[in-house]
């Protein structure tokens, strides 16, 4: 499995599932020996840590500039442009952003509350087409959190509200022109359009989150606070994810912003 490129966490989950399965079979006397006993789980150090892709300081500025572009008639070039800037400077997970409602925004106190998540599910009847479902929970217990808004995030969401808020706090911040849920595919397409126009070699929403985290590291914020803002279940996850980011890249971020 390691040779196939699977991550340590994926292999560990498979190992634990198989081990539990065969242990139960031994208990039920369906087999006499657990074949997983002789299987050695590779250590985490044996895996090559992937280099996270993050935007440089100049690229973050360029992203903001392009995402907020206006057409000749004054209309926004990108319907979700201000929303994407907001995500870039709050570090929200994709599902958290798509599940965000106006009631979760507290502009007076400069904060946003994260307490739910959007996932794509099937109907359970064999149809391949998936539909969006709002989970009244997030990825981890620590994921329920309040994130303070910096000036850029506050301005971006204020502009978004001025354009799209209709007075209903139950409405979702990210929704289509017809009022339906925006899907991960839709939002990924939107962010990639901004990347392309800005001539940034990047793809996907996750880069916005990684860039914000790296930006906070470069600014010298303590890891325990970064972990809390990101909604990680432990500080160790934050370390494991971001300590390998290239230092020169971090230095470029902090000097360019």
What are the roles of these predicted feature ranges?
Residues 12, 31, 37-94, 98, ...:
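Basic, Lys/Arg- and aromatic-enriched nucleic-acid-binding interface segment
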Residues 27, 85-96, 185-197, 207-233, ...:
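C-terminal catalytic core of tyrosine-transesterase DNA break-rejoin enzymes
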Residues 124-128, 221, 240, 244-257:
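DNA/chromatin major-groove-contacting recognition/catalytic segments
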